[in-house]
Amino acid sequence: MNTCTKTNDSGISHRHTPKPDRLGTFFHLVFICCAMVGVVSLATIAWFLFSEGLAAFRQAGVIELVFGSEWLPPALFGIFPMIAASLISTLGAVLTGVPVAVLTAVFLAELAPKWLADIVRPAVELLAGIPSVVYGFFGLVVIVPAIEVLFNIPAGNTLLAGIIVLAIMILPTVITISETSIRALPPVYKEGALALGASHIYSIFKVLIPAARSGILTGVALGVARAIGETMAIIMVMGNAPAMPGSILEPARTLTANIAMEMSYATGIHASALYSTGIVLLIFIVLLNTGLLYINKKRVH
Amino acid sequence: MKNILSLAAAFTLLTAPLYHANAAVSVSGSTSVSNVVEVLAETYQKSSGRHVDVQGTGSSSGIVAAKNGTSMIGMSSRELKAGEAAADIQQLVIARDGIAVIVNNNNPVENLTRKQIKSIYRNEITNWKQVGGEDKAIVVVTRDASSGTREAFEKILGLKRQVNGIPVTSISAGAQVANGNGMVKTLVANNDYAVSYISLGSVDNNLLKALKVDGITASDENILSGQYSITRPFILLFKNETDPRAADFIRYILSDKGQSIVAEQGYIRVK
């Protein structure tokens, strides 16, 4: 080691001094910048929402706004019915959509004959590309009248219609991510289960799905985010009444619908109240994501 | 060289609309008023060659746009509120419009009184049976909180109440809310038991029908004679020292040609 250093000192040192790696530094910076785009956007959106929405919180009071049940701008700004509508529609969509999606993913990854998988998979992928206004229109002309006939109610623009549309909308996200994570499992899991005498179906439910849990939960988290953030389709099928829904067969307005419907006109404290609706929505998404991340970590360990 | 040329061409193409927009008369505001002003702008452009830029953004923002000068002309489909009027802003009624109470064509009900309409929107009458129709629940459809049509409808029928000293709507919170005339029409056309309200000029007779109010048909004659009571003005707002190009467009709207276009579109002429 010492000899080596000596040789360096005596004459050819310039060959061994590490050249500043300009290209490396450059790309390092590019990577950092790219990674920061998302973070900076989020920070800007949050800052914007808080700076615009705080006025309404200050005037109406946090409790009054979050737990108030009457939305009567510009006097009362209670968004509790909308919080309830957002949570119920998302929960309903997850409860109905996720089982269907996970079973579809298992079918595609494990059971489907190739020709059938080649029909189902592109169909699911196509579903992801359909704009939400088309889902809304589909809901309005197919699901809404169907609910009117099935439940014999005067108007089918209800929470239930929203739940069904959202359940369909989250399918592609959950299916694609779940299928990928099931396929990514090492083949020894399944081989081991089968070698121990487990049936194919038993190995799917007891080995493959539990092993792919982390990926499936990621899919569910993205599905939840899509469902709670959906606006256009929901406005078209859910009736948008700002009252507390008594059942899923009554109209309701979600947080996103409230912002979208009134933002273009609102001024002053009314506009501020809409931004605070956005703050509440943001907080919910953060809580949901944190919750799912936590479950994910806990189960994996 | 080629690159520079194409860059220059692209730049010209990109900035051309900006130049064009600067030279045009800008009008923004009520979506109901913009329906007729768009047609007026088209014919005006044909006869004078001058461009008019019309944007439907809602009455409230139209009034703001006229006051702060974002648009040369603002449009409103309701009277200005006390806080909205300004000394340097002129108001001009260019047409009158009736608000029709609409139901699905399959609904046998033909007539409602003002009192019944008010009770329906307050959720005091909830079944068509109570107003002479079938034994079916009424599906009440209203517009979003800041629509000019809704504001006028509430004001004319007295669907207002005070909360903490601030006037707010007394339309039942359980009513369905549609965010535009198009959606109101879709909802009523697809539901036999729905009731809503819409500008008379936008009623599509194939799918929905306008009810008589207190026995009076919603027609131009009855609005002109003052018998049909649910009407509202279409107002243009502009600064006292109006841009000459905007003033010329306004003169055109009030001319015989302009006013007959107003009538053709289903609204009531003022001259």
Spell out what each predicted region is.
Chain B
Residues 13-22:
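C-terminal segment of classical bacterial N-terminal signal peptides
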Residues 12-13, 149:
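Alpha-helical transmembrane segments and their juxtamembrane interfaces
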Residues 8-9, 52:
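A ubiquitous, low-specificity "background" feature that marks scattered single residues
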Residues 1-8:
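Bacterial N-terminal signal peptides that target proteins for export
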Residues 21-271:
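Exported/periplasmic ABC-transporter solute-binding proteins
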